[in-house]
Amino acid sequence: QRQMCIRDSPCMAKKKEAREEDIADAIDYVLTFQEVQDIFDAAGIQPELLSEDEKEHSSRAGRIYARTGGVSEAVKKTVEQIDPDKKIPVIPEQADGVPACKKLIERIQKGETEANFFEGMACNGGCVGGPKIIIKKEEGKERVDAYGDEAQYKTPLENPFVLELLERLGYDSVENFLENSEILTRNFGE
C-alpha cells in the first residue's frame, strides 16, 4: 500500500512550493487549513472529540516555527546547544509582513543591523497569520506558544527519536550529519 504525504498549512504559497522540481516527489498534496476544515465538516469529523496522540516526538524548536520569532529562537537555541562556546553568537532579527521584510533587506544592504541571522515572515504574525487561517492570528500564536511549552524536548538535539533516526541513517552525531549531509540543501536551479 502506497503511503501519501499531505501537507496542511494556512499558506497558499506551499501549494506552489510543493511542485518545485527538487521537492516535487516529497509531497503528494497540500491542503490549506480551510480546506481541511471543509473536508472535516463534510465528513462529519469533529477533531475535538478524537483522542489525542500521546506519541509526541517534536521539540519546542519545531513547534514554534509558525509564529514570528519562532524560527530565530529555534535556530539560536539549537546552535547554542551544538556549540555552547561559539565565538560568534547568533544574533537574530525578525521582519513581520512583506513591507517589514523589504525594509529589513534594505537595512541589511546598508549595513544598518548588528544581527547575523534574519527571519522574514511574509504573513503578519508568521504562518499563524496566513491567508487561510481558521482562527485569529493572536489565538494561533498563543496556541503555538502553549504547544511549544508542552514539548518534552527543547531542540531536536535532545530528542532521542531524532538521534536514533540519524544513527539509522549512518550518522553518529548531529555534527556528523550536518557536516556530511545535503538533506538541508535546496537546489533552486539557475
Language-model-detected regions and their locations in the chain:
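Proline/glycine-rich low-complexity loops and linkers
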Residues: 7, 15-17
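Phosphate/adenylate-binding glycine loop and adjacent helical scaffold
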Residues: 11
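Iron-sulfur (Fe-S) cluster-binding modules
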Residues: 19, 24-190
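Short, small-residue-biased leader/transition segments that mark boundaries at the very start
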Residues: 2-6
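Mid-sequence acidic-hydrophobic segments that form the walls
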Residues: 1, 14
